From Swiss-Prot:
Major subcellular site: cytoplasm
Gene Ontology terms: biological process: 2-deoxyribose 1-phosphate catabolic process; carbohydrate catabolic process; deoxyribonucleotide catabolic process
Cited InterPro entries: Aldolase_TIM (IPR013785), DeoC (IPR011343), DeoC/FbaB/LacD_aldolase (IPR002915), DeoC_typeI (IPR028581)
SMART domains per record: DeoC (SM01133)
Phylogenetic lineage: Bacteria, Bacillati, Bacillota, Bacilli, Lactobacillales
SUPFAM superfamilies xrefs: Aldolase (SSF51569)
The EC number(s) this enzyme carries: 4.1.2.4
Top-level taxon in the UniProt lineage: Bacteria
Record keywords, A-Z: Cytoplasm, Lyase, Schiff base
Active-site annotation: 89, 151, 180
Name of protein: Deoxyribose-phosphate aldolase
Single GO term (MF): deoxyribose-phosphate aldolase activity
Reactions mediated catalytically: 2-deoxy-D-ribose 5-phosphate = D-glyceraldehyde 3-phosphate + acetaldehyde
Amino acid sequence: MKLNKYIDHTILKPETTQEQVEKILAEAKEYDFASVCVNPTWVALAAESLKDSDVKVCTVIGFPLGANTPAVKAFETKDAISNGADEIDVVINIGALKTGNYDLVLEDIKAVVAASGDKLVKVIIEACLLTDDEKVKGCQLSQEAGADYVKTSTGFSTGGATVADVALMRKTVGPDMGVKASGGARSYEDAIAFIEAGASRIGASSGVAIMNGAQADGDY
């Protein structure tokens, strides 16, 4: 198992500086992580920095609340891809999901999938705000809409990934869809626990610490 290729090396805090982004990019190249996940404003910088590596550029859409309209999320997606994004992590319409307005949830994800072309789409369900039934429904709708992954968390709500949520999401989507655990992996042991529960990708700001077997503090 190449643990480095499970990791989306992540820096999403709003106060992030260019110097901090450049540090993350350098680390991603050094450790050959799966991707770097940055806010849209840093996508062009990341794409330029990573162009001669196989580290992908991941960004976030409708982040962190998920409460924009489908048209806005689709525009954000197209803009991010035009700037060099390879992977799109979009926040599901959490309020619509909890209301039971599944048509809107589906339309919302489909708009991003359509705008993404052949790029990878991961749907953040924000599991910490959902009941287990809502988590299952969010995963099912993401799958129906043609997304490539479901993802546990933004890292900016009341909680991050749990092993139980990852296991439930994997059970729901089966073997052919990706599951990303984010906002909960701070150590090598955390990462392995998520992978054993069914995670195929891990979003963490602690990628270097995970690879070095150390404990990291902080989230995104």
